Regions:
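RecA-like P-loop NTPase motor core of helicase/translocase proteins
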Residues: 1-223
Length: 223
């Protein structure tokens, strides 16, 4: 939390938590702390905190844990219906959004459709907002075109265009390639990633880590 407050938006944090380390509790606590994090000017640092699991069905344990931290109406919204529900939550700036990675490929079209219905054309204010993205099991969920859509939805059209170009040239796009492209162009100023994994691969460390190392490590011995 101290680092996120000091460094501001646009950084990656790899959290290596071994099995039995209470990862769901840590993610729940982090989501709520990030959603209420304020700058020195007393402004909210993140407009929304998006908690993503790579499971097709929302992780019930993780979902319940997050709900336990705050029962107030409208603070936490689980996306268990369709992608339109997710798009509406992003547009509304719901403080904490819980969803699966599989829903993101459809969000771009839904956001544009809702903007048109309101007479706003095809421009969405999503890329101008600031997001904290918490990824559960980063090593398994961050690959393919679904992750590319996540970056495009929250990062804007320019990043999505770059991802599409890579997809055309190389077929299936892995997030590692996309992050390398982002690194060359600078970090995305409106997104901070908090990636949780028990078994970080070399590429995961290279992309999310700090100098190839996790930002925080809770080992099996400590657990």
């Amino acid at each position: 939390m101290e680092a996120a407050s000091t460094e501001g938006v646009g950084h990656n944090y790899l959290v290596e938590h071994s099995a039995g380390s209470g990862k769901s509790n840590t993610i729940g606590w982090l989501a709520h702390r990030l959603s209420s994090l304020h700058s020195d000017r007393d402004e909210r640092v993140f407009d929304s905190v998006v908690v993503i699991t790579d499971r097709v069905v929302l992780d019930r344990q993780l979902q319940n844990t997050i709900y336990q931290f705050d029962h107030r109406q409208g603070v936490v919204q689980k996306i268990d219906e369709d992608s339109r529900q997710l798009a509406e939550a992003l547009e509304a700036g719901v403080p904490i959004i819980i969803t699966t990675l599989q829903k993101f490929p459809f969000v771009s079209g839904q956001v544009a459709k809702m903007s048109e219905e309101r007479g706003e054309g095809r421009k969405s204010h999503l890329p101008t907002r600031q997001y904290a993205v918490i990824i559960d099991e980063a090593h398994s969920s961050q690959s393919g075109e679904t992750a590319t859509e996540l970056k495009g939805v929250l990062g804007g059209a320019e990043l999505r265009q770059k991802a599409q170009e890579m997809a055309e040239e190389e077929g299936e796009v892995e997030l590692e390639r996309l992050f390398r492209a982002m690194a060359k162009r600078g970090k995305q100023p409106n997104m901070s990633f908090f990636a949780f994994t028990a078994t970080p691969k070399h590429k995961t460390l290279a992309i999310f880590g700090r100098n190839g190392e996790p930002f925080h490590c809770y080992s099996m011995r400590q657990a």
